[in-house]
Amino acid sequence: MSTNKSFSSETSERYSRALFEVANETNELDKIENDVRNFQSLFNSSSEIKNFIQNPTQSKNTQNNVINLLSENLGFSKNLKNFFLLLIEKRRIFFVKKISESFLRLCS
């Protein structure tokens, strides 16, 4: 990787490649790509969701509950839901916008 890349860019690319590999290996690439587009649309259109996800003071438990609810209501793939839960566990959920953008670039 280029040394000029920021930590957030490198981290986002690493996570997006991991999601891409899981989606590809489980033959869910189209489904997860569509789910990520739906999530990205929600994230970009809802300041409440954006602020909630980017707020570092939110507890992991609260973030997990919100992701579980969103996943259920929007019909996200189990793999995408688990990926979001991993991001929360690793305290990387605030990278979700960059990860989503990077993932969608990989899909195109």
What are these regions (language model features)?
Residues 1-108:
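Elongated, mostly alpha-helical coiled-coil "stalk/stator" tethers of large membrane protein machines
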